[in-house]
Curated annotation (Swiss-Prot):
Spans annotated as Disordered: 1-20
Sequence similarity: Belongs to the bacterial ribosomal protein bL25 family. CTC subfamily.
Entry protein name: Large ribosomal subunit protein bL25
HAMAP family tied to this protein: Ribosomal_bL25 (MF_01336), Ribosomal_bL25_CTC (MF_01334)
Keywords recorded for this protein, A-Z: Ribonucleoprotein, Ribosomal protein, RNA-binding, rRNA-binding
Amino acid sequence: MANHQIKAQRRKDEGKGASRRLRHAGMIPAIIYGGEQRPVSIQLNHEQIWLAQQNEWFYSSILDLNVDGAGAEKVLLRDLQRHPYRQLVMHVDFQRVSSDAKLSVAVPLHFINQATSPAGKVGGVVITHELNEVQVSCLPKDLPEFIEVDLSTLNVGHVIHLSDITFPIGVELSTRLDKEHDMAVVIAKHAVIEDDAPAEEGEGDSK
């Protein structure tokens, strides 16, 4: 598992006015909560977070949050608020992580070998990804940045369900599966060709 470090500083002033001043200075108001410690208000460099939030790992990995150079604290991103139309992160929430407590995290799916699968080699076939992430439960040390879904044997007319995915050791779905709740992940089927529009009434009738 790769280490991803985020630098931060403690935030002294709070409130809307203080948060507005932080944003004008190129910083983001944020908070750390969870565990046995009290919540801590912090501030983050906007440029660093803006670049980080463009990567999958920022949302599904354990992050090393270093506040005032005091050493890394293991956290997980729990909320990120963006401005509705500007390239601006408004606020970030981090949750402390305990090494012996299981987490419930949405992990992205990476689909491999689609183009070389039997369905991928047939013209006129549409392969749809019904899910792009799954909610898993695991200890922090077992948390994967992504889960691969191998489509090498996918045929036309086949459906890959959640129960068909191989999860890493120590990782399991957050919800139990049964026949009624085994969601489709990938579907391969022939493209539907719509018929030409019906002729207008009377068109082609002999007079």
